[in-house]
UniProtKB/Swiss-Prot annotation:
Region of interest called Disordered, as start-end residue ranges on this chain: 1-86
Chief location bin: secreted
Keyword Repeat: yes
Sequence similarity: Belongs to the frog skin active peptide (FSAP) family. Dermorphin subfamily.
D-alanine (Ala), modified sites: A28, A65
UniProt key word Repeat: yes
One Gene Ontology MF term: opioid peptide activity
Protein name, entry field: Dermorphin peptides
Biological role stated in the UniProt entry: Dermorphin has a very potent opiate-like activity. It has high affinity and selectivity for mu-type opioid receptors.
Length: 86
């Protein structure tokens, strides 16, 4: 019985220490548990979306600027080069 009580007391102390540490982290970072990760994830997702939009806009602008659909200008360059070698 004595050993069982000691292990229960140790477990309770360990749990209290974990709670204190997590509470200290919350105060240190200024966010409730897990909130900081969520905010970081949301900002990364927003950055990825913005980058995708920029890439789409850039490729669309190139198409309009050069007047050819994607890859068509390269094919047109290749054809005269192939005709010269024949």
């Amino acid at each position: 019985k004595k050993i069982k009580r000691e292990t229960e007391e140790d477990e309770n102390e360990n749990e209290e220490e974990r709670n204190e540490r997590s509470e200290m982290k919350r105060y240190a970072f200024g966010y409730p548990s897990g909130e900081e990760k969520k905010i970081k994830r949301e900002t990364e997702e927003d950055e990825n979306e913005n980058e995708e939009e920029r890439n789409e806009e850039g490729s669309e602008m190139k198409r309009y600027a050069f007047g050819y659909p994607s890859g068509e200008a390269k094919r047109m360059k290749r054809k005269p080069a192939e005709e010269e070698t024949e």
